[in-house]
Every structure is written in structure tokens, then in C-alpha cells.
Amino acid sequence: MDAERQGRIWDYWQTARPDSFGGAHARLRHLARRAGRTRVLNVGIGDGAFEEASLALGADVHALDPSAGAVDALRARLNLGERAQAGSAVQIPWPDGYFDAVVASEVLEHLDDATLLAARDEFARVLRPGGRLLGTVPAREQLSANTVVCPYCTRAFHRWGHERAFDPAALRDLLSPRFAAVAVEERVFVTWNRLNWKGRLTAVARVALVAVGGHSAAANLLFTAERA
């Protein structure tokens, strides 16, 4: 799926359906705590939950997203001004070594081969030496499970615009050429207050499964790396 079509999907979810990101809040709050009180760039703003959590922790938070509408809404809600920019991960509009941390949560799986490598290199460019890259991707996703068909053109596509699936080895292979101390772990993040009792029981089972070394379709791969 090309960048224009990806943009259509995410412009819809971020501007017309920001409520759809509620299940991601636990994951985003975790990443905000990991980034800490630093100058941090979040790539892909969703409903702004990461930015809100980072500001509450005292971070100097910046945001980048291809959706101008989502950026305008975030600026208005959190008073970020020029710290929130519309743009691409392959051409980040901040100077070399500007950030202590870059966060990319549920971003990499949307990128084609060339864009993925270019984005990785841009993350490294805007991080200071020793700065940290943090993020998540779906764990071992079966892409076909989320394939849908357009009823107008009959073209099949991934409902969220995912281009690839990752396992820990694939993430390490991607990041190691530009980053040191690459670490990957499988985690289940649960936003408990969004669930009824049945959902909570299911979430407990998923967390327990991953804790004993199993795999869950609801899990994420949490990665951290340092700019050399």
C-alpha cells in the first residue's frame, strides 16, 4: 500500500475516530515513562495519549505525524505549537542530534522496505549520541488475519495498512546497523479500564501466557536501542 493510501486510513482514524486509540493508552503511558523527562519525539500521534502522558511527567515532548488535521487538533488541545509538525519519518524536520529519545509505537509495520530503512536512519540522525529509540510493533502478526476486501474495487488490503510482520530477530536485524544495545521483549499491554469482566479475564490469560514464554496474538514486541 502506497503512502497516500496509508495516509487516508490514518487520517480517518485520527480525525474522525480518535476514540479507537483508547486500547493503546497503557502501551503509550509505558513508553512515556521509559522516555522520562527528556526532549522526546513521538512519531505517529494517534489520539495524543503519548504526548499527554509525557507532558504530565515533565518531558519536552515533540510530535510528528503525516496527518495535518491530527497535528492541528493536537496543537490546539495540548498547546504544543511548533513542537507538533506534520511530516514524514523519512524527512524529520528537526536538526541532527536534537532529541534524547525517539518513540515509534506501532509505526514500523506500516512502512515498505525503502521507507523503513530511511526512517530508521532518520531516527538515528535526530538522536544525540547515546540517545534512545523506543517503540513497539505487533508481535509475530499473521497479516492475512486482518486482510479485508474493498467492496468497490475488490482489492484486498490489510485493514490497518500493515506492510510487514516482525519477530525479535527481524527487529534486531533492522536496528543493529545503526544502533547499539538493541533489546527486544514480548509484552502484553492492557488498558484495564476499557474492559468488562470478560475482557479482563481474557487479558489476564494473555499476560500469563506471555509471562511463561508463550505467544499471544494480542502481544507487542517492545524494543529499545541506543544511538552509537
Where are these regions (language model features)?
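Conserved hydrophobic/aromatic "anchor" residues
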Residues: W94, F99, F166, F179-A180
